[in-house]
Amino acid sequence: MAITKNKISFFLFFLILFSSASFAEPYKNLSEYNFFKDIKKQIPADNVIPYKIANPLFSDYSYKFRFVHIPENKAAEYSYGSVFKFPIGTTIIKTFAYPIDERNLEEGFKLLETRLLVKNDFGWIPLSYIWNDEQTNAYLKYTGHTFNVSWISEKGEEKFVRYRAPNVNQCKSCHEINEKIQPIGPKGRNMNIDFNYQNGKANQIDYWQKRNLLKNIPNILNENPAIWDDINYNISDRARSYLDANCAHCHQKGASANNSGFYLNLDETNNSILGFYKSPVAAGRGSGGLKYIINPGKPDESILLYRMNSTDPGVMMPELSRNLKHEE
């Protein structure tokens, strides 16, 4: 059997992972971590904090339940413009699920996978747990998994998707910056919003601070996100927020699309680097015969929109996390 480059990469990743003296072997069952009071209903334990982010990645209309466990007497550090600096022992938890009927979420969800990012002396370790059919537990799996999923949409339409849980090596393609795996979502501009906690609504950053889970917070918080689907924000800021959430994890310096010279992180200000009148470095048929990544005022002549609208695996962007077009 031929050994592909991807298989070699996968093997080397785990060789390094398990040769680290600081790496404790992960649990085989998600329930063994005791992150949840009710694992099926995703009700967290008292030492696990639920959260949401302002502009989440589109993942084929899946719902995501996010949580973080920070060790007792430890705290994350606020870092302006970037992901919070979490202490060793932190676990970031994200469960992907689809509702039975989106018109009535009380009917429940079909849980598919729970991803963990575990921080230890080695760095951040990605792990994926696949849920059983009985929805009683999820089991560690390194090689990915595919689900055929159906659900009823808000419009009462039956929807279908072939949902792919990535293998652990694929996690690096989105989470690796300068050859180090790190979280993506928990940063000031994503967290500076309200969350409905069991004891009432509160700003997430204030809530974390009051629970001594976040320190070094600026006196004036000026990281206020433009919500991409909120018409109260101007269209330019909404577009930048969407592209930052859905593209910038790869399209930024030091990330997997570094060589493209095309970056979409919010703090990028150079129009050429943002793709204005920029020809692709190597898009192949992904260019669709178009000349510029962004042709201002001409979205139908822009490679960016062409690839975002495509569902062809050889063309579409992002390459992972979606099989459907984001109609909205």
What residue ranges belong to the model's regions?
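N-terminal signal peptide c-region/cleavage motif recognized by signal peptidases
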Residues: 19-20
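N-terminal pre-domain segments of enzymes
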Residues: 23-69
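Short, well-ordered loop/turn sites that connect or cap secondary structure elements
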Residues: 86-89
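Short alpha-helix capping/helix-loop boundary micro-motifs
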Residues: 76-81
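Sequence context surrounding c-type heme c attachment/ligation sites in exported
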Residues: 26, 102-328
